[in-house]
Amino acid sequence: AVHQFMDRLKDVRFYGLHTGTLGFYSDYQDHEVDEFLDVLIHHEGKEEILSVLRGEVNGNCYYALNEIRVENAARTQVMDVYVNDIQLETFRGTGMCVCTQLGSTAYNRSLGGAVLQEGLDLIEMVEIAGIHHSKYRSLDAPLVLKSDSVIQFESESFEGALLGVDSDVYSLEDCKKIEIKICGARHIRVLRGKKVSYFDRLKTLY
């Protein structure tokens, strides 16, 4: 639903009603629909601002709430990784995942990334199946960065690679460089109707 309104985020607020277990976007489950509607009608609750990731490839911009990924299942992806214009490493493997605080509990977590507590305006980068032996080494650990950090991936060839933007994917065939950062001009506004502990939400993941 969020991606349908990416160009209108200044005019939209999101109200979450969860039909499964309690999620990170919503405070109400389907059996609490009456309470949910009462908050909605009376404009009660507290507004929370969520960061949006911005990825730029060949002049095209892509926006994600959870994560932006570079993945190559066809062959080993070799790329130079830069943080704030400083080369961190040359990575070899399947790819890299960059996530927001909210996205840290999603694909990032399954990759062994750290879960970031709510309220922390940070981004995180983690490897996807990196190759590590005596000849090739990289950080091989989650890297948590300040929200104003800029991450760049550069390669002579992204043949076979895909750019994952939350649940959407795009080809990187003609790409040489990918830039990822927090988008200062776009935020997602979510209405919180009742106080639910972050750790109670976290426990629904396991």
What are the roles of these predicted feature ranges?
Residues 1-10, 43-45:
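N-terminal glycine-/serine-/threonine-rich phosphate-binding loop
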Residues 7-19:
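Gly/Ser-rich helix-loop-strand patches that form or flank binding pockets
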Residues 20-94:
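Catalytic core of DAGKc-family lipid kinases
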Residues 49-53, 64-66, 75-79, 94-96, ...:
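A generic structural signal for short beta-strands and their flanking turns/coil linkers
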Residues 62, 70-73, 78, 83-88, ...:
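ATP/nucleoside-binding phosphotransfer catalytic cores, i.e., glycine-rich phosphate-binding loops
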Residues 89-135:
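Gly/Ser/Thr-rich active-site loops/lids in small-molecule metabolic enzymes
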